[in-house]
Amino acid sequence: MATFFISDLHLGTGKTEIQLRAIEFLSQEAPYGDALYILGDLFDYWIGDDAPTAEGLAIITALRRLADVGVTLHFLSGNRDFLVGQVFSQASGCQILSDPAIIDLYGVPTLLMHGDTLCTDDVAYQRARARLRRPAILRTYLALPKSWRRAVAQRLRRQSQAHVQHQPLTIMDVNQTAVETALRIHGVKQLIHGHTHRPAVHHFTVDGHPRQRIVLGDWDRGKSALSCTPEGFHFSDSRILEPRFGNLQG
C-alpha cells in the first residue's frame, strides 16, 4: 500500500533523459502503489488535447498501462499544462483534479496544489496567470491553428524563463502567509505542492498546531518522487538529506 506524488517533469522535445526516467518510474516503481498524484507541469507546455506531442503520447501510453494494472491516477494541472482536458483524461486514465484539492492521506487531511498560486509576492506572474486563464482568452487560443498555438506557447515559455532569471529567489518562492492561509481555509494539517523546484520538507505551526509543507522537486537532475504509506513518507530525491519522515498526526 503506497501513494505516490510527482510534479514538474516538464517533458518535451529534447528532454530524452527525463522522458526515460519518467517511463522507468511509471513502469517499474509506480505499479507497486495504489495511487499516483501528478501535481502539475508534467509537460513543458500543452497546447490542447487535440495536439499531443510524441513525448506526450508516450507518457499517455505509460499512464494508461499503469491505470490498467489497477493504480488510481490523478492529474492536477500546473502553469505549463493547464490546457490538459478530458481527452487526455480518457486516454491516460487520469482523473482531473481541481487546484486546490483535499485528500485523506491515510487518515491525515492533506491539501494538494501545484503551488504557483502560493507565490503571491510575484505580482507580475499572478496577473499574467489570471489573464491567460480567462475563458475568452482560452477559447480564442484553442481556435487557432496548431502551429500558431505551438508558437505562442514557445514564446510564453521563453518569456517565463526570462522573467525567472531576473527575479530575486525570495519572490519566486511561496509566501508563508499564503501557505498558512490556505491551511486555515481548508482545515488541513499538511500541504504537498510543486512548482518552485525546491524539494524540501518544512515544519512550522499555525495557531499553535504543528503543520507540514512538502515541496516536490523537478526531474532535471534525477528522479524526484514522494511516496506515502500508513507508516510515513519516503522522499526519493538526491537533494533530500533525511528522506524518511512522518505523516503529520494531531
UniProtKB/Swiss-Prot annotation:
Reaction catalyzed: UDP-2-N,3-O-bis[(3R)-3-hydroxytetradecanoyl]-alpha-D-glucosamine + H2O = 2-N,3-O-bis[(3R)-3-hydroxytetradecanoyl]-alpha-D-glucosaminyl 1-phosphate + UMP + 2 H(+)
Keyword set, alphabetical order: Cell inner membrane, Cell membrane, Hydrolase, Lipid A biosynthesis, Lipid biosynthesis, Lipid metabolism, Manganese, Membrane, Metal-binding
Names of the cofactor(s): Mn(2+)
Residues bound to substrate: N79, R80, D122, S160, Q167, H195
Covalent S-S links between cysteines: none
Annotated positions binding Mn(2+) 2: D41, N79, H114, H195
Cellular component GO terms held in the UniProt record: cytoplasm; extrinsic component of plasma membrane
Record-listed E.C. numbers: 3.6.1.54
MF annotations from Gene Ontology: manganese ion binding; UDP-2,3-diacylglucosamine hydrolase activity
Keyword Transport attached: no
Domain of life: Bacteria
Keyword Signal: no
One biological process term in Gene Ontology: lipid A biosynthetic process
Topological type in the membrane: Peripheral membrane protein
Cofactor binding, per record: Binds 2 Mn(2+) ions per subunit in a binuclear metal center.
Binding residues annotated for Mn(2+) 1, in chain numbering: D8, H10, D41, H197
PANTHER family: UDP-2,3-DIACYLGLUCOSAMINE HYDROLASE (PTHR34990:SF1), UDP-2,3-DIACYLGLUCOSAMINE HYDROLASE-RELATED (PTHR34990)
HAMAP family: LpxH
Family that this chain belongs to: Belongs to the LpxH family.
Function according to Swiss-Prot or TrEMBL: Hydrolyzes the pyrophosphate bond of UDP-2,3-diacylglucosamine to yield 2,3-diacylglucosamine 1-phosphate (lipid X) and UMP by catalyzing the attack of water at the alpha-P atom. Involved in the biosynthesis of lipid A, a phosphorylated glycolipid that anchors the lipopolysaccharide to the outer membrane of the cell.
Protein name per UniProt: UDP-2,3-diacylglucosamine hydrolase
